[in-house]
């Protein structure tokens, strides 16, 4: 994927990081040329991550030294994903627009709601 200059500007203006864009591309739903990760989907993903973290912490207490480091690594990765998902949830969701392999723009889902 190629980030355009426009994409970099919009990410800077709207407080989106590359990790948030990558997370949206991997977990979001596709609608036309957009990847959308809304609040509801993000909340479902967070509950899934929380359950996995809970299970891994339970497995750590078993004191099985052969898989201890693997579990710690997986736990660390899940915590990073959880942190990113929480940022996206705070924004109300994110939309990323693509044109082929070029990332065109990104915006918060609730950015078009006007009072």
Regions found by a protein language model. Give the residues of each.
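Ribonuclease/tRNase effector modules and their secretory precursors
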Residues: 1-115
């Amino acid at each position: 994927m190629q980030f355009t200059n426009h994409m970099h500007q919009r990410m800077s203006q709207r407080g989106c990081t590359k990790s948030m864009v990558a997370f949206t591309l991997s977990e979001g739903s596709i609608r036309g040329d957009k990847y959308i990760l809304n609040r509801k989907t993000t909340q479902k993903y967070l509950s899934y991550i929380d359950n996995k973290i809970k299970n891994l912490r339970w497995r750590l207490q078993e004191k099985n030294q052969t898989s201890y480091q693997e579990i710690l690594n997986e736990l660390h990765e899940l915590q990073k994903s959880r942190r990113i998902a929480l940022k996206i949830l705070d924004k109300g969701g994110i939309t990323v627009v693509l044109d082929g392999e070029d990332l065109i723009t990104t915006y918060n889902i609730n950015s078009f709601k006007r009072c």
